[in-house]
């Protein structure tokens, strides 16, 4: 039986009908109505389709039962033809800005399913997602469409969510079923949604600006979590595994738009690579697309090289599992439109580079020097060869450079230590030609494959998984002893973009068997540079120094030489069990440049040098490698950050300015193996000019450097090409000093006319310090150069007086003097141990939480002063922080002083990201050669106190005026992994100047901090050892979910305090400090957002990677309660979700004290004096006794309370005193408490720094004083507590606010927004002196004739309002009227409604399914309010009087909101 209709109409059909009618009011404004008919249907799917004659397995073994989206013709009887390439994917939905997408959906499957878009503007009945959002049953019909039923979804593509200026023409999103994210996805319910700029699509929906467009979904399907369970894990592209994806077709010189989706119900990363091609993504040139499960990217590619090219994810397990396909580029006779013409000057810059590289077998020592500080467990597991382990020495193959084609004289006589295991650096500019003569001096076939440049098939050097042996050419696999020449030119389409660094970081490796070749050691760095980026020597012009850091995971179990290593290094080779988890793990080496532990030598840099870091992740790792730089920040892609995330087989270029003296650490953030193995120390030091010697000595030193530091990329000139060296403006000073500006001033000067000395001087100037690419330097030699490293870097630091104690005020003062500004912000923070309960309020309703949810943890807590006696109680602004420590706020150029007290039972510290600090305020422990004075910050003992001093340089703050604040984090750094899992972490917000008040709060900004983390209690210091997983379980990767809690701010499911106004700017600061596998994709339902400082790029979801601090800006456009979640289904299902509420900006309606809607029985007080009872405390009340008043006695704390009988949003309070016999009584100051249940009371704090906010009251007995409640509060009970008063505490009150569910604003009867012509009636009363017409039925209308009266008084009369379009009506207020002395009002009434002004339906009583009769007024002037639960969804509404007093008379207001 339909809830709103007398006749039995299915709910879904009713809602469909209402929705279709509502659309007609929006067709005029839409660029286009795009209609799709989509069904969810069962399908038997074969991940490995084979020709019938090749199949020998039964159908049940080959196929899996799936639910998929398919597009149909109008009547849902004929499925539309689809591209074979789309596979499991549903049809691609497209819409331009201004369009309306209408999806007619039918469920042919056996499970309730839905359609939910990652980005679109939709109302609650087109969301397609089920959660507790306070909506009615009729609004939840979209959440889960039952089998056999239909539904129509309506999505608006507005300018607010469309692509921004810097975005590509179309942005890529996904749509999917959101009934059960894990099971729905693994069953196959997913498709692509393209949201495009206006005018970017053809009539057929294809993009105008590309020759071709393709959607590829890289996904992992866990069939055991399908609705139709069948154990299997499938690694696929568009649902095709093992290379069975139909070939993607293209023509040479095509411009292709790629829409790439990553999907998995568990955390997953993909490194998408197109062999032999380059792509452009977000205006950056890439060779690998970094993709995470739950997110999508848009990229484009221009192709020129014909052939069949591999498409794959370079994550090792993906390749092994068959996640690949092919791009087939044909010569279709199209002209070359990709090569631009160069000027004569540009042509002269073109160079030929020739390298002679061999593959050689060596014995590699992963840790030639093991510092005493190395973790003993790590050392025993990876570096010792006890327990029949191999240890730290392995036979490997490496790339080595030779001087010529004879391959007899290496460029290095002694292997340079700093270069490590890496092959020589290959560099080239756009249009340069690179020739690599490769000789295989190893014992098995190898090759060279380069990333980041377009190559021909002859120069590819890669064997594909499906290559038959007869197709393996000489270049793909060079046999032992053979020589092959690879030759390629850097094309215009390979050139770094304007936004890119001068040189972008790529790599090369052997690709006969990529996984095993890399595991064997054959890797090297490659730099692709802009036309003006390199000197004739191959040195980058805009960097003082270049430094390579390759974070490589070598899985020696997959090396070609495993058997050799077992025989040589294991004490008992015959007893080795290669499948033993402990043995296997001991052979997986986490390295930086091939070293698996810290080295005793320290990398040296000169103070103020600009270092160009080239960072790469290589190897069998299936995790992100987060690279952390201490004491400094990377400048990468226009953003300062101190953690860069490297995806497998990808690289990043970043600039680091050496501006902080001391020995610092570059290391991987994350697992124990990564942080111990992937690390190196570097020195940022001053070198005294007086030690540099005279001019002759400098020349001698230059000769030494020329000999020792000759780069591996020495150019072997094959053709004489005229080249000019043109310094960039930023290098003019250096160029003038070296006498190199004559080249530009005298164009006739050719390369042959330059002196060798000029080139040597430029080389030396660019490689000051000890660098990885130029070999090691003997200590004795360094003593005779200008670069001699001092054994104690702090000895030359003028800030240090070893004879005096450290004084934090002195440090702060020095910072303040340096920046010529005196603004110091003090914080008092303690580490305390607490019992933390992960269970939400409604734990019994959550099935996925473990039985035990309460654990001992340590948290940061704020105190008011250095006595640490009075905690700073959190207020409404801190309510959402959960487990997070207090927010540390500062402005650019401030100095932060944090006094830290350790009230816990074990050592902790404070370590800050993104800020500038001396070694004595780092809060981390490693071998940094610091004096003892500088090590006291490393670990503060229990009950100890220490003051950390941090400076806020400009790089720590917002990068432009559009960005308000930038987020970082602080945590205990004694053992970061264990400390954070124990709970010790908090946010840092650095804001523009003038944005923080004296209480350290931001001014006029709505901001929230969200910390996404899977807390693993087994990694906490406080977890009982007896409950931990066994060593065997850990070694094989078994993780018990009983002790892990995916949460936001440490609270699964029900984080509180996320409330904001519609259309206000909301700033979200998102943190992720989890390990390498902690990948979260943040989705705000119903809203889109931009990243702070990058407002030119639109986001629908945000991948939040390990060590990421992201600040985003949102302008909520839809009121209501919405879901905030991770798109990683398994984490979402287990609690990484929360609700946020968007309230109307007009949420300041009187709640009913003045009007009488709030009854006398709802108002109470602690007491009253004489006849001044609580029920009289109504704003503007009149009479002799017209307010509440009380005589305050000593030690008494009076209050007055209003029970609103439901939870509402309170946004303001109006107060008034009273006057009796010319005597004024009023409250001067008061505070507010509130409660949801009448038992647990909260004192409103707002922005006040103390425990409560004191509101300014009245200054006389008659004036109304209004106070704003910000942030808004949700409560049922409100109490006002007078603290200061005149004569006696006295109140007349009105509360301002709205309903929690939203959609409760007046629709326009009282204001006149509803026109007179839109109000009609069955009849109206006319007299010779007045007419009681329908349009007079407006609430609170004044005058002698101020209401609607019908001509006759009977039950056939009605008042009708036409709202002009489909509207959600949530409540009504009725009022009577007075004529002469006659009180007229309606005592009872019913409601009818319709959407077509024809078929009227009565509003039914939910309990009886009969027409509901509402109780009306009891007098002619008072208000009575009724709520429609469920709400009415209609255009027309009628009020039908049933009984009345004297005569029918009505004044009304309707409340609700528009549906669209």
From Swiss-Prot:
CDD domains: CuRO_1_FV_like, CuRO_2_FV_like, CuRO_3_FV_like, CuRO_4_FV_like, FA58C. GO terms for biological process: venom-mediated blood coagulation. The keyword Disulfide bond applies. Residues 1-30 form the signal peptide. Residues 32-196, 206-330, 351-529, 539-685, 823-991, 1000-1143 form the Plastocyanin-like domain. Ca(2+) 1 binds at residues 124, 139, 142-143. One of its GO terms (cellular component) is protein-containing complex. Residues 740-760 are annotated as: Disordered. Residues 693-817 are annotated as: B. It comes from the Eukaryota. Coiled coil: none annotated. Gene3D superfamilies: Cupredoxins - blue copper proteins, Galactose-binding domain-like. Residues 1147-1298, 1303-1457 form the F5/8 type C domain. Residues 772-817 form a propeptide. Disulfide bonds join 170-196, 251-332, 503-529, 672-1031, 965-991, 1147-1298, 1303-1457. The record marks 771-772, 817-818 as: Cleavage. Glycans are attached at residues 156, 242, 300, 385, 406, 471, 557, 943, 1000, 1180, 1397. In physiological conditions, blood coagulation factor V and factor Va are inactivated by activated protein C (APC) through proteolytic degradation of the heavy chain. However, omicarin-C non-catalytic subunit (factor V-like protein) retains its full activity even at high concentration of APC. This has two explanations: this protein has only one of the three cleavage sites present in factor V that are targeted by the APC for inactivation, and the binding with the catalytic subunit protect the cleavage site from inactivation. Residues 32-330, 350-685, 823-1143 form the F5/8 type A domain. It is found in: Secreted. In contrast to blood coagulation factors that circulate as inactive zymogen in plasma, venom prothrombin activators are always found in the active form in the venom. Hence, catalytic and non-catalytic subunits are found naturally in venom as stable complexes. Belongs to the multicopper oxidase family. Heterodimer of a light and a heavy chains; non-disulfide-linked. The interaction between the two chains is calcium-dependent. Found in its active form associated with omicarin-C catalytic subunit (AC Q58L95). This is Venom prothrombin activator omicarin-C non-catalytic subunit.
């Amino acid at each position: 039986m339909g809830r709103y209709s007398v006749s039995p109409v299915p709910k879904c059909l009713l809602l469909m009908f209402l929705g279709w009618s509502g659309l007609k009011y929006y067709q005029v404004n839409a660029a286009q109505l795009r209609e799709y008919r989509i069904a969810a249907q069962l399908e038997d799917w074969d991940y490995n389709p084979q020709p019938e004659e090749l199949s020998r397995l039964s159908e049940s073994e080959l196929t899996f039962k799936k639910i998929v989206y398919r597009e149909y013709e109008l009547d849902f009887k004929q499925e539309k033809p689809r591209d074979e390439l789309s596979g499991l994917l549903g049809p691609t939905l497209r819409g331009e800005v201004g369009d309306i997408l209408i999806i007619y959906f039918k469920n042919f499957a056996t499970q309730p399913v839905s359609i939910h878009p990652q980005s679109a503007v939709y109302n609650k009945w087109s969301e397609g997602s089920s959660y507790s959002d306070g909506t009615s049953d009729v609004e939840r019909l979209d959440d889960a469409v039952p089998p056999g039923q239909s539904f129509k979804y309506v999505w608006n593509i507005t300018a607010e969510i469309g692509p921004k200026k810097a975005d590509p023409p179309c942005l890529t999103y996904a749509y999917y079923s959101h009934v059960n994210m894990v099971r729905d996805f693994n069953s196959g319910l997913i498709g692509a949604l393209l949201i495009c700029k206006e005018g970017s699509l053809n009539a057929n929906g294809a993009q105008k600006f590309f020759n071709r467009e393709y959607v590829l979904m890289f996904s992992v399907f866990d069939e055991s979590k399908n609705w139709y369970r069948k154990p299997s894990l499938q690694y696929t592209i568009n649902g095709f595994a093992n290379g069975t994806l139909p070939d993607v077709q293209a023509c040479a010189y095509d411009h292709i738009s790629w829409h790439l989706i990553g999907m998995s119900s568990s955390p997953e990363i993909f490194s998408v690579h197109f062999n032999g091609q380059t792509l452009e993504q977000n205006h950056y040139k890439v060779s690998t697309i970094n993709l995470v499960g739950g997110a999508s990217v848009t990229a484009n590619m221009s192709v020129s090289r014909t052939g069949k090219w591999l498409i794959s994810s370079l994550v090792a397990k993906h390749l092994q599992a068959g996640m690949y396909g092919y791009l087939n580029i044909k010569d279709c006779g199209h002209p070359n439109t990709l090569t631009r013409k160069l000027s004569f000057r540009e042509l002269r810059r073109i160079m030929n580079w020739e390298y002679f590289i061999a593959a050689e077998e060596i014995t590699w020592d992963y840790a030639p020097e093991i510092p005493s500080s190395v973790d003993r467990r790590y050392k025993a597991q990876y570096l010792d060869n006890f327990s029949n382990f191999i240890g730290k020495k392995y036979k490997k193959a490496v790339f080595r450079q030779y001087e010529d084609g004879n391959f007899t004289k290496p460029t290095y006589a002694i292997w340079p230590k700093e270069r490590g295991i890496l092959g020589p650096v290959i560099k080239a500019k756009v249009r340069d030609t690179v020739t690599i003569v490769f000789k295989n001096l190893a014992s098995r076939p190898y090759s060279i494959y380069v990333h980041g440049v377009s190559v021909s098939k002859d120069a590819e050097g890669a064997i594909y998984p499906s290559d038959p042996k007869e197709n393996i050419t000489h270049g793909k696999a060079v046999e032992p002893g053979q020589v092959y020449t690879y030759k390629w030119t850097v094309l215009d389409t390979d050139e770094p973009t304007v936004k890119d660094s001068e040189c972008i970081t790529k790599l090369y490796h052997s690709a006969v068997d990529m996984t095993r070749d890399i595991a064997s050691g054959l890797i090297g760095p490659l730099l692709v540079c802009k036309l003006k980026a390199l000197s004739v020597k191959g040195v980058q012009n805009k960097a003082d120094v270049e430094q390579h850091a390759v974070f490589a995971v070598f899985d020696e179990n997959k090396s070609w030489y495993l058997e050799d290593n077992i025989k040589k290094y294991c004490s008992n080779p015959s007893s080795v069990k290669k499948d033993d988890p402990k043995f296997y793990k001991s052979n997986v080496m986490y390295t930086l440049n091939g070293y698996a532990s810290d080295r005793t030598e320290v990398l040296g840099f000169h103070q103020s040098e600009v270092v160009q870091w080239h960072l790469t992740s290589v190897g069998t790792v299936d995790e992100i490698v987060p690279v952390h730089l201490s004491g400094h920040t990377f400048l990468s892609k226009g953003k300062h950050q101190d953690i860069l995330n490297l995806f497998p087989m990808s690289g990043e270029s970043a600039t680091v300015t050496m501006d902080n003296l001391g020995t610092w650490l570059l290391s991987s953030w994350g697992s124990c193996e990564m942080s111990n193995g992937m690390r190196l120390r570097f020195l940022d030091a001053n070198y005294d000019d007086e030690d540099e010697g005279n001019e002759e000595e400098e020349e001698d030193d230059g000769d030494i450097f020329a000999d020792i530091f000759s780069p591996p990329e020495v150019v072997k000139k094959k053709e004489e090409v005229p080249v000019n060296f043109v310094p960039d403006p930023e290098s003019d000073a250096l160029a003038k000093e070296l006498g190199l500006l004559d080249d530009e001033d005298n164009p006739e000067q050719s390369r042959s006319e330059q002196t060798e000395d000029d080139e040597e001087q430029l080389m030396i100037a660019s490689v000051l310090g000890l660098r990885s690419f130029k070999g090691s330097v003997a200590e004795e030699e360094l003593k005779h150069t200008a670069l001699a490293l001092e054994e104690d870097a702090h000895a030359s630091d003028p800030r240090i007086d070893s004879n005096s104690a450290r004084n934090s005020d002195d440090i702060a003062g020095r910072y303040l003097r340096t920046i010529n500004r005196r603004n110091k912000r003090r914080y008092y923070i303690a580490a305390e141990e607490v019992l933390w309960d992960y269970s939400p309020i409604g734990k019994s309703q959550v099935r996925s939480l473990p039985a035990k949810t309460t654990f001992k943890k340590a948290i940061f807590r704020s105190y008011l002063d250095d006595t640490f006696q009075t905690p700073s109680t959190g207020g409404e602004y801190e309510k959402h922080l959960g487990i997070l420590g207090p927010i540390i706020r500062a402005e650019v150029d401030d100095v932060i002083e944090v006094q830290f007290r350790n009230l816990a039972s074990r050592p902790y510290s404070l370590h800050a990201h993104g800020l500038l600090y001396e070694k004595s305020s780092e809060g981390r422990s490693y071998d940094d050669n610091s004096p003892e004075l500088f090590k006291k910050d490393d670990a503060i003992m229990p009950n100890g106190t220490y003051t950390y001093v941090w400076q806020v340089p400009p790089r720590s703050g917002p990068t432009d005026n559009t960005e308000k604040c930038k987020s970082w984090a602080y945590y205990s750094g004694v053992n970061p992994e264990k400390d954070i899992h124990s709970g010790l972490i908090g946010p840092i917000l650095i804001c523009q100047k003038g944005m923080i008040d004296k209480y350290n709060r931001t001014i006029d900004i709505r901001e929230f901090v969200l910390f996404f983390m899977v807390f693993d209690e087994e990694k906490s210091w406080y977890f009982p050892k007896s409950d931990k997983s066994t060593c065997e379980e850990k070694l094989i990767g078994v993780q018990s979910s009983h002790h892990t809690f995916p949460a936001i701010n440490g609270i699964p499911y029900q984080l509180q305090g996320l409330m904001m106004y519609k259309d206000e700017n909301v700033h979200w600061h998102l943190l992720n400090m989890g390990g390498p596998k902690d990948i979260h994709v943040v989705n705000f339902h119903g809203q889109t957002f931009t990243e702070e400082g990058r407002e030119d790029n639109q986001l629908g979801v945000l991948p939040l990677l390990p060590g990421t601090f992201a600040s985003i800006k949102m302008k909520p456009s839809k009121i209501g309660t919405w879901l905030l979640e991770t798109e990683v289904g398994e984490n979402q299902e287990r609690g990484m979700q929360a609700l946020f509420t968007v309230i109307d900006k007009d949420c300041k309606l009187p709640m009913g004290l003045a009007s009488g809607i709030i009854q006398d029985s709802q108002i109470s007080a602690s007491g009253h004096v004489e006849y001044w009872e609580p029920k009289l405390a109504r704003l503007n009340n009149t009479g002799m006794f017209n307010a509440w008043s009380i005589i305050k006695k000593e030690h008494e704390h009076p209050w007055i309370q209003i029970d609103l009988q439901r939870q509402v949003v309170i946004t303001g309070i109006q107060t008034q005193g009273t006057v009796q016999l010319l005597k004024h009584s009023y409250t001067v100051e008061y505070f507010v408490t509130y409660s949801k249940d009448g038992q647990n009371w909260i004192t409103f704090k707002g922005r006040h720094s103390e425990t409560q906010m004191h509101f300014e009251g009245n200054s006389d007995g008659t004036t109304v004083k209004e106070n704003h409640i910000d942030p808004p509060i949700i409560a049922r009970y409100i109490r006002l507590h007078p603290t200061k008063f005149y004569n006696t505490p006295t109140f007349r009150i009105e509360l301002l606010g709205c309903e929690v569910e939203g959609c409760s604003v007046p629709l326009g009867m009282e204001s006149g927004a509803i026109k007179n012509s839109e109000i009609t009636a069955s009849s109206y009363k006319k007299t010779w002196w007045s007419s009681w017409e329908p349009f007079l039925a407006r609430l609170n209308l004044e005058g002698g004739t101020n209401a609607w009266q019908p001509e006759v008084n009977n039950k056939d009369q009605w008042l009708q309002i036409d709202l002009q379009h489909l509207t959600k009506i949530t409540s009504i207020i009725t009022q009577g009227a007075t004529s002469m002395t006659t009180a007229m009002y309606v005592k009872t009434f019913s409601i009818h409604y319709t959407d077509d002004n024809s078929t009227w339906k009565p509003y039914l009583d939910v309990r009886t399914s009969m027409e509901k009769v509402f109780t009306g007024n009891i007098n002619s002037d008072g208000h009575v309010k009724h709520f429609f639960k469920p709400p009415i969804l209609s255009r027309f509404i009628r009020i039908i009087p049933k009984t009345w007093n004297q005569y029918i008379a009505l004044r009304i207001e309707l409340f609700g909101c528009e549906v669209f």
